[in-house]
Amino acid sequence: MTEYDLVLTDVRVVTDDRDEARAADIAVRDGKIVEVAPGLDTAGARDVVEGGGKLAFPGVVDAHQHWGIYNPLDQDASVESRACAQGGVTSALTYMRTGQYYLNKGGDYADFFPEVLERTADRAHVDYAYHLAPMSKGHIAEIPDLVREHGVTSFKVFMFYGGHGLHGRSADQSSFLMTPEGERYDYAHFEFVMRGVQEARERFPDIADQISLSLHCETAEIMSAYTQLVEEAGELTGLAAYSASRPPHSEGLAVSIASYLAHETGLPTINLLHLSSRKAVDAAVRMGRAFPHIDFRREVTVGHLLADITTAHGPGGKVNPPLRPREDVEALWEYVLDGTVDWVVSDHACCREEAKFGEPKDDVFLAKSGFGGAEYLLPGMVTEGTRRGLSLGRIAALTAWNPARRYGLPTKGRLAAGFDADIALVDPDHTWTVRAADSESAQEYTPFEGFELTARVTDTFLRGTRVLTDGKVVGEPTGRYLHRPTGR
């Protein structure tokens, strides 16, 4: 008789390495999966959970969130991680930077980042890690210490921040970014960030493949000009106006610039974030052909796959890059289905009503950018993906295996012996209507309000401990900071 802490019986196990699910039980000991096989002996198990034939997905590795951007960081860690559990997310990788929002301060990461860790310790219901954005020359010099001391292996550039605001046009981005006097956040800075990340890869060759740079690809000059054109014409309103003010070719141009800079600096690990349009992904594909020595990874969000400028529920759907017309949504699905897209994320950024909307409330240019959505990530992908012929295994790759490999999480992303027992049980035949009131998030609205989904996460396990039961978060926070690469 083998002793287990948990045996999950009668589930259909989904893994990235096979298209369809297979019937099996999952045995867990000390937070790790020790066996996946049919008919496991449960006599010595401390806990047995009957899966009822549900799909067992690896816990989602949501590689793009924004804890603390609009709410206190400790609050988001506690509350928004509950929404994560609802969506089957067990590892949340959240972007962080100095400047306005977040901790609302500048300075060195040597002082800033320990405060970030302190504010989130013992609060999250899921495991978490941080990507950091080098906003100054001093931050670039800190990259090796961030890798060595804090296990931060992924960094970010916001390509439009130097000349265009987070929510629209801005004449004073230096104050917003809190960059040192005399420094510019521009293409030259992006080049030097790339050189700094590449130097870190060379300094730590054993983990070089896990050290990468992610880029938000939009072009400030194009967006500023088109925002003025849209406002002066006055013909478009709402999300259609916002999409037109940040046109897809702005993404494509930024992708092209970022790609050439990667070639110039010799940095091969580049992640192109939340590509929202056919033109953006087309540019990414073209750059991959032009620079085959660069290991590009391409990301899209579940929001851009589920909603468009017409179906999203009002200006609450404002986000960067914008939600697009339906033809771009269809194009993104083409790229998901043909394997061009590497992973799908939520870009979860809880923005409560009092912060989100301006006056008048329906003026999209007065609204803030971003919304929550982690709770709909896996349900949305299973619902819409399977409807379009996407295999279950490919969904597991897009939501867990691929981001875990890129971002230095070797024990995450697969339901197999030796991996963390991060498990999401999904009922693929549960039809339900999205209502913001049913979410654990502090956000009172959702752009997906009224959407009908046909799959639901019923139970979520973090390292073998159940954190979601019958759709409700249970227990105290047990999430841990992921010092990457984990297990090193």
Residues covered by each model-derived region:
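Short catalytic-loop micro-motif centered on adjacent basic/acidic residues
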Residues: 94, 129-132, 269-274
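N-terminal metal-binding scaffold of metallo-dependent hydrolase/deaminase domains
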Residues: 1-44
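Active-site metal-binding motif and surrounding structural segment of the metallo-beta-lactamase
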Residues: 39-56
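His/Asp/Glu-enriched, well-ordered alpha-helical/loop segment
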Residues: 236-266, 316, 343-344, 350-428
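Metal-associated gating/positioning segment near the N- to mid-region
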Residues: 51-123
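Divalent metal-coordination and catalytic microenvironments
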Residues: 11, 31, 53, 64, ...
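Histidine/acidic residue-rich metal-binding segments in metalloenzymes
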Residues: 141-157, 161-344, 349
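C-terminal cap of metal-dependent C-N hydrolases
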Residues: 358-363, 369, 417-483
